[in-house]
């Protein structure tokens, strides 16, 4: 039987960042949650797709909640306690992801909406006819 060789690849170093920034990008199709330290170095991230949802289910609030819980748990394992939340995008999972971060035990110090709003720039997509 073959022995497994221990790989000496890149290892995740423990950051011990107590404060950080949580970026929530919520689109109509997916929600991506990235937790960084104050410098902007990523500590943990998760998305609806990475949490096991596929297709149209990725855009649901429950998928966003699952992604936020997963990212928050990883960040708290690295010592994070407080976070600022920057929300971006028009998706369904915005509020649910913030509530999931609070429920996971992270103290939220600031919630800021950084969704870019055009000064009448590009033409939006046409309305769906179902």
Curated annotation (Swiss-Prot):
The keyword DNA-binding does not apply. It is found in: Plastid, Chloroplast. Keywords: Chloroplast, Plastid, Ribonucleoprotein, Ribosomal protein, RNA-binding, rRNA-binding. InterPro entries: Ribosomal_uS11, Ribosomal_uS11_bac-type, Ribosomal_uS11_CS, Ribosomal_uS11_sf. One of its GO terms (cellular component) is ribosome. It comes from the Eukaryota. Its main location: plastid. Pfam families: Ribosomal_S11. Part of the 30S ribosomal subunit. NCBIfam families: PRK05309.1, uS11_bact. Belongs to the universal ribosomal protein uS11 family. This is Small ribosomal subunit protein uS11c. It comes from Porphyra purpurea (Red seaweed). The lineage of its organism: Eukaryota, Rhodophyta, Bangiophyceae, Bangiales, Bangiaceae. The gene is rps11.
């Amino acid at each position: 039987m073959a022995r497994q060789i221990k790989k000496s690849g890149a290892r995740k170093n423990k950051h011990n960042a107590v404060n950080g920034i949580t970026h929530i990008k919520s689109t109509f199709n997916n929600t991506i949650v990235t937790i960084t330290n104050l410098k902007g170095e990523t500590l943990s991230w998760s998305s609806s797709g990475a949490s096991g949802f596929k297709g149209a289910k990725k855009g649901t609030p429950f998928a966003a909640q699952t992604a936020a819980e997963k990212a928050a748990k990883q960040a708290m394992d690295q010592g994070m306690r407080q976070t600022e939340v920057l929300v971006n995008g028009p998706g369904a999972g915005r509020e649910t992801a913030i509530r999931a971060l609070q429920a996971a035990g992270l103290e939220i110090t600031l919630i800021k909406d950084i969704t870019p709003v055009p000064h009448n720039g590009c033409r939006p997509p046409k309305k769906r006819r179902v």
